[in-house]
Each structure stands twice: as C-alpha cells, then as structure tokens.
C-alpha cells in the first residue's frame, strides 16, 4: 500500500497499515544509517523548514539530521530568533514561509491543534513535531520501532506508561499507536495528572498505583514531569513524586524479567527513574534516540511522495 497523507499530524489519524508502513520504512532507513556514508539522494532538491516555537534538542536535531541524510536542504527557524517575538501570528508566519516555496514544514508549537490550522493554510506538507498536550507522532513511532526491534512484534505486548499523563503529548501518541498495533496499555500517575476519560482512547486501563501498573508488563515507559506546563498544586514535591511514581531497581522487579525501560527524554534523574535504572542493560533510552533519526527519515520520505533511492 502507498501512503495517502500529505501531512502527518498525529497517529490518531493513521490506520494500523499506515503505521506498519512507516515502521517498515524506518527499518530500511536504519540500514542507511549504519553505512559509512550515511546519505542518499532521495530528497535532493527538496527544502525542509524546521519551525520550533518550543525548546527542543533531540527532536529538532533528529529531524535536521534525517532531512540531511536524505539530501534535502534544511532551514531552522526558532521562535526566540524569529518575528514571532515581534508579535507575528502563526498564520502570517505560515504565509511568509510558504512564499519561500518549501516542500515540508516540520513544526513544534505550544498550542494543541496548531498543525491542523497550519496544514489547512499551506500547500506543502506539514509534520507535527509536538503540539501542546495533543500529540507527538514521531516519538510514538520511534517508541514502537524500539519495542518491535526487541520483541519482534507489538501485538500482544503490555506496556505501562507512568507519570504526568495530563500534559503528555507522548502518552497520547503512544496510546493511539500501541493500541492500533494490538498492545494493551496501562496508565499510572498522580490523580491530578490523570485526565478523565483517557481510557476511552483505546485498549487502556487506568491503574490505582504504579506497582499495579508495572506488574508483569513487557515495557515500562516513564514520562518526564513537565514542570513548565503545570501549577504548583498538581505536584507537592519532587521527592514525594519519586517515592510513589519513580522507577527504581526494587519496583522494576515487578515487571517481567528483562522488561524494557523507556523514557522520551529529557530525564529528571532521581525523579522519574533512578540513574541505576536509566543506565542499566534494561534501558532502551539511547536506542530510542538512535531510532528517532530513522523514523523521521521515513516520515519525510512518505509525505514527500517520492521513490526511495538507496544508492
């Protein structure tokens, strides 16, 4: 099957088959990334504009590397150094970028739904690099690629996602993607960080506490505490959070032997998980980062609609 979408706004919009196609393509891209010369001419002559209204290291750098390995020209625009600081609206920014004739816009924005708004107003492709608490599709895809790499399939896995679910766009993309691919998701977090009705998003169980959530699971996904997105009333102290919802060698034993530990980064060591767990053989955190480049290459390739050139 081909990829029918001009844009990738969220995994909620994609079918199981389309997610499978993106993961399979990412596997092919991993082969390119393992070469001595990590570059193919697939997107030669194409221009990718990265527009980031929020701070990012891994995602922005990963998209830039992905575009360059496909031979695209890349332009990076940061909100702190752009006309946004002078009061320019998203709509005006879009018009000005579009006047430069880009082929793909990769954007991160603090407002949920900003990418739908943008995609309706530009003729080029739009890829969501994270919008508010809505979705982060490339993170969801790289998480699934990392799981499939270890277990061979996502079908039948039980995955615990622990932490600040309310403010996490990663959690939503993981839920949409994992449940479509046949996994069961358990959620745990402080009641003030658990949105009502979240279980309606798919094959999801909301657990009373962390120990219940991680017992017997294949994967433990820890989420970052997003202090920049919440008021003081949601989280009494980081020490208290770590006591009840932090992953350490003791409670990790509740999961299946050899269970995989994941985190979208950046990590608050000693809060979401201990340094011992983060640096252990069970941790797949650096593998997630590595797989991020391949996944983003696959996303850029499919929205461009081109044929894969591998020589």
Curated annotation (Swiss-Prot):
Amino acids binding L-aspartate: 86, 169, 224
Record-level GO BP terms: 'de novo' pyrimidine nucleobase biosynthetic process; 'de novo' UMP biosynthetic process; amino acid metabolic process
Reactions it catalyzes: carbamoyl phosphate + L-aspartate = N-carbamoyl-L-aspartate + phosphate + H(+)
Listed pathway(s): Pyrimidine metabolism; UMP biosynthesis via de novo pathway; (S)-dihydroorotate from bicarbonate: step 2/3
Xref: SUPFAM superfamilies: Aspartate/ornithine carbamoyltransferase (SSF53671)
Gene Ontology molecular function: amino acid binding; aspartate carbamoyltransferase activity
Domain of life (superkingdom): Bacteria
EC number: 2.1.3.2
Keyword Protein biosynthesis assigned: no
Keywords: Pyrimidine biosynthesis, Transferase
Entry function: Catalyzes the condensation of carbamoyl phosphate and aspartate to form carbamoyl aspartate and inorganic phosphate, the committed step in the de novo pyrimidine nucleotide biosynthesis pathway.
Quaternary structure (record): Heterododecamer (2C3:3R2) of six catalytic PyrB chains organized as two trimers (C3), and six regulatory PyrI chains organized as three dimers (R2).
Family named by the database record: Belongs to the aspartate/ornithine carbamoyltransferase superfamily. ATCase family.
Protein name: Aspartate carbamoyltransferase catalytic subunit
UniProt source species: Geobacter sulfurreducens (strain ATCC 51573 / DSM 12127 / PCA)
UniProt gene name: pyrB
